[in-house]
Amino acid sequence: PDVAQPWSYAELVLREKYPDLPEVEDEYAVSMQQKVLRSMIEEVAFAVSTNESRPVHTGALFEIADMSLSMVAVDGFRLAFRREKLEKLEGGAFSFVCPGSALSEVKSICGDTEDLVTVTLGKRHILFEIGDTQLICRRLEGEFLDYKNAIPRKNPIQIVAETKALIAVSYTHLTLPTN
């Protein structure tokens, strides 16, 4: 249909002209607060690879098990990992890789609120339900890096520090004297 006014004219496309949205079978679903998911994405997305030679690493791995969500991203040089407890889990343990572009969209849609976001995993797609908004993206297929073996478990060097002090140091410039 066309919309015409004396000062403007617009040609609109009907909904029927667009392809139907894919059906996402709700095999698995998880719910968490929007602010928690947003924070997880902010802390992990920087390590999502932009190199297309390994397409599966252009996204972040979501691992859901034992009432917790682990999010992992790697780019060949960096590995980012974050784990959070879940509020609601349906269907048991599961994992998937979400494209980095979809992560940035989810982050922009999520507010700094305790309202829930539901993530539903289908055979080929992922559905994010954030309030009245639905975002559907295609899962990335392939073998994601075994990050558990990439992080050494036994190391003779251990550092114990207060979180606030460590964060304060990370934002300052240290100059160490040399002998």
Task: Identify what each model region corresponds to.
Residues 1-174:
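Structural preference for solvent-exposed beta-strand-turn elements
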Residues 175-179:
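A short, hydrophobic C-terminal helix/tail in secreted or cell-surface proteins
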